[in-house]
């Protein structure tokens, strides 16, 4: 019988869900879903100063916004400290760990000596076999693992391949600090084991941790989960993604107007590939995803590519679904709060009618919202400077005549208003472009907009006639 797949995402609360963490969570979620398993969420909150409720909520909110749903209740590492201590004491009682009374000064000397001699191993093992009766007064001991002194520690990694460490270069790592708090290395192993984790998918900056954690697994006689260490995300210049490259948190991408589905699609392709396919539905991701298809090289974050992909998702999004995304984004994007009070049955209907034209011109929700501002504008419309310069007395007189021609349209839609304007143009020996721009300025306050007949249809007859009247010569 095959053991059900259990993955986990285990972030530390930093105040936001890092974009790299979002990709790690996505990979864990996809792998679990592909194999009919579960993805668990563990918050590694042992740093009490940083682990505020707000910092934890930022991670949970980021995952929910990305559409990554975890299974079961969230596990909080700090709540399991007693269990971590229990395992350390068990290893001590079995002679597989020992108390180390080395002082801070002694440890510093050991590190300096090891570095001077070019040795990877920093701790010299001086308390490994000494009797506790020799312990100095006033020193609170740590508990260290009795790591193997010879041989190799080997990880068969699903991404990195076979990785070998010489045990002579690995320290007897600390399991329990002098104040009784467990170290990260011990806590992670105990938690993963107790949670039934079968696959650990995480960044390759944890590779050295894998060697140390395997030694704990081996000492306890526990089965090592399958490991997959994925390459980190780098900036466009090839260096590690940092603040200077721009947004780091998932929340920042929401504020920049990216769609969750687009960001998921972009993140899954950072380091993983499936032939030449670029666009994936969620189900296609689940069906195609596999660990060996993840490359070993760092993936470069390309903001232009993300923006183009986001534009694709906006253009192909159902209008009603895009309406929901539009409204939800108002709480997060710059200037969104100004529009929110203006959402009502009338403006929602106008927005829905305008959506086919608006979404063709937008790569982000911010651009979509900016393009739609004319719908929510109060009368008389604010006219941008470039457009105002075109509102000559002659243009205003033309707007009066256009309004009169449109007033006679009974069944109001893009086709009927276009027919009326074409007839007007022919009767007055004008090109259609000569009347489209005055209409656009009067109806939107701008020189650019969706197709003018789409604008007429979206706003409706009453609003259009009122706005045209505002900009006419009367």
UniProtKB/Swiss-Prot annotation:
This is Glutamate--tRNA ligase. GO terms for molecular function: ATP binding; glutamate-tRNA ligase activity; tRNA binding; zinc ion binding. The lineage of its organism: Bacteria, Pseudomonadati, Pseudomonadota, Alphaproteobacteria, Hyphomicrobiales. A motif ('HIGH' region) lies at residues 11-21. SUPFAM superfamilies: An anticodon-binding domain of class I aminoacyl-tRNA synthetases, Nucleotidylyl transferase. Catalyzes the attachment of glutamate to tRNA(Glu) in a two-step reaction: glutamate is first activated by ATP to form Glu-AMP and then transferred to the acceptor end of tRNA(Glu). A motif ('KMSKS' region) lies at residues 240-244. Pfam families: Anticodon_2, tRNA-synt_1c.
């Amino acid at each position: 019988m095959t053991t059900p797949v259990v993955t986990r995402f285990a972030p530390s609360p930093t105040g936001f869900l890092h974009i790299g963490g979002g990709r790690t969570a996505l990979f864990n979620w996809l792998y679990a879903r592909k194999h009919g398993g579960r993805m668990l969420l563990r918050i590694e909150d042992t740093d009490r100063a940083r682990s505020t409720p707000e910092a934890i909520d930022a991670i949970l909110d980021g995952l929910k916004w990305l559409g990554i749903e975890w299974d079961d209740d969230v596990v909080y590492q700090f709540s399991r400290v007693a269990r971590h201590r229990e395992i350390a004491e068990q290893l001590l009682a079995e002679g597989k760990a020992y108390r180390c009374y080395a002082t801070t000064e002694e440890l510093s000397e050991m590190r300096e000596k090891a570095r001077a001699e070019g040795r990877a191993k920093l701790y010299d093992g001086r308390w490994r076999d000494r009797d506790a009766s020799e312990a100095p007064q006033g020193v609170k001991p740590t508990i260290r693992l009795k790591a193997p002194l010879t041989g190799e520690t080997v990880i068969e990694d699903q991404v990195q391949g076979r990785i070998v460490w010489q045990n002579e270069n690995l320290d007897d790592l600390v399991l329990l600090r002098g104040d009784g708090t467990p170290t990260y290395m011990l806590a992670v192993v105990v938690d993963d084991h107790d949670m039934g984790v079968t696959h650990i998918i995480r960044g390759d900056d944890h590779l050295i941790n894998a060697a140390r954690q395997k030694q704990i697994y081996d000492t306890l006689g526990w089965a090592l989960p399958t490991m997959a260490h994925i390459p980190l995300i780098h900036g466009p210049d090839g260096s590690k993604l940092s603040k200077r490259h721009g947004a780091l948190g998932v929340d920042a991408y929401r504020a920049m107007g990216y769609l969750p589905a687009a960001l998921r699609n972009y993140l899954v392709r950072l380091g993983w590939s499936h032939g030449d396919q670029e666009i994936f539905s969620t189900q296609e991701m689940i069906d195609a995803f596999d660990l060996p298809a993840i490359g070993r090289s760092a993936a470069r974050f390309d903001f232009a590519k993300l923006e183009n992909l986001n534009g694709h998702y906006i253009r192909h999004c159902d209008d009603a679904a895009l309406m929901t995304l539009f409204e939800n984004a108002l709480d997060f994007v710059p200037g969104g709060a100004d529009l929110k009070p203006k959402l009502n049955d009338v403006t929602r209907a106008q927005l829905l009618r305008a959506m086919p034209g608006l979404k063709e011109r937008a790569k982000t929700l911010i651009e979509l919202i900016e393009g739609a501002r004319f719908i929510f504008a109060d009368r008389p419309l604010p006219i941008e400077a470039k457009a105002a310069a075109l509102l000559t007395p002659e243009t205003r007189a033309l707007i009066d005549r256009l309004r009169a021609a449109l007033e006679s349209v009974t069944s109001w839609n893009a086709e009927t208003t276009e027919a009326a304007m074409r007839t007007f143009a022919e009767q007055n020996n004008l090109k259609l472009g000569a009347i489209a721009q005055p209409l656009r300025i009067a109806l939107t306050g701008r020189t650019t907009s969706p197709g003018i007949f789409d604008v007429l249809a979206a706003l409706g007859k009453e609003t259009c006639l009122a706005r045209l009247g505002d900009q006419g010569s009367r």
